[in-house]
């Protein structure tokens, strides 16, 4: 993540590289603003910088996700309708007590996705840390069950009174609409 605040942060990159090397990892910086990417490019032209759409943010109005009104959200409504017709489900508030089930679902999800193993392992570690410090980090989330099986969960936190950030969202895609329902 790009450091926050004013001023030039590029002088910190050698320290970040040393820290990554000590952890046996290559240095990866994500979440750069266009200005931050330009600063890194100027200070370290040897670095490769590219866009990864898999890590881009999606911004929705909370009311839009709650109500799903309009033509734009028709596909989401269709997913929800199919899910509700097909499954007897329940939604629960996410608590750290559900961590083992969430980690199991994450492992199942990861097994079905072709991606960079190091990135996925880092995500798994981050998820475990999030559960370990759930209260301290003021995290909130939801869990979706079909019968007794956890089929989706989400973890996030309030950015301010008007914005909420989803940090992790996983669903068993064999349950059509699970991602959409956990979002609602």
Predicted regions and their residues:
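Acyltransferase donor/substrate-recognition loop-hinge adjacent to the catalytic core
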Residues: 45-116
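Conserved acetyl-CoA-binding loop-helix of GNAT-fold acetyltransferases
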Residues: 8-18, 175-184
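Short, aromatic/basic amphipathic alpha-helical patches
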Residues: 36-47
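Short, conserved active-site entrance elements at the starts or edges of catalytic domains
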Residues: 101-149
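Aromatic (often tryptophan-rich) hydrophobic motifs at membrane interfaces
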Residues: 139-184
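Conserved GNAT acetyl-CoA-binding A-motif
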Residues: 22-34
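Conserved acetyl-CoA binding element of GNAT-fold acetyltransferases
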Residues: 1-7, 13-14, 162-172
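Short, polar loop motifs at secondary-structure junctions
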Residues: 32-37, 76-78
């Amino acid at each position: 993540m790009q450091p926050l605040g004013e001023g030039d942060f590029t002088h910190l990159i050698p320290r970040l590289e040393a820290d990554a090397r000590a952890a046996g990892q290559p240095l990866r910086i994500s979440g750069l603003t266009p200005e931050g990417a330009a600063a890194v490019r100027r200070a370290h032209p040897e670095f490769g910088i590219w866009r990864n759409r898999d890590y881009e943010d999606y911004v929705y109005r909370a009311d839009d996700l709650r109500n799903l009104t309009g033509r734009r959200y028709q596909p989401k409504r269709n997913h929800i309708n199919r899910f509700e017709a097909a499954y007897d489900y329940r939604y629960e508030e996410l608590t750290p007590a559900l961590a083992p089930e969430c980690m199991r679902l994450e492992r199942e999800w990861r097994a079905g996705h072709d991606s960079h193993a190091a990135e996925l392992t880092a995500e798994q570690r981050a998820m475990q840390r999030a559960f370990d410090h759930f209260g301290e980090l003021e995290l909130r989330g939801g869990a979706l069950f079909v019968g007794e099986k956890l089929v989706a969960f989400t973890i996030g936190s309030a950015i301010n009174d008007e914005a909420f950030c989803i940090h992790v969202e996983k669903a068993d895609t064999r349950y059509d609409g699970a991602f959409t329902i956990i979002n609602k």
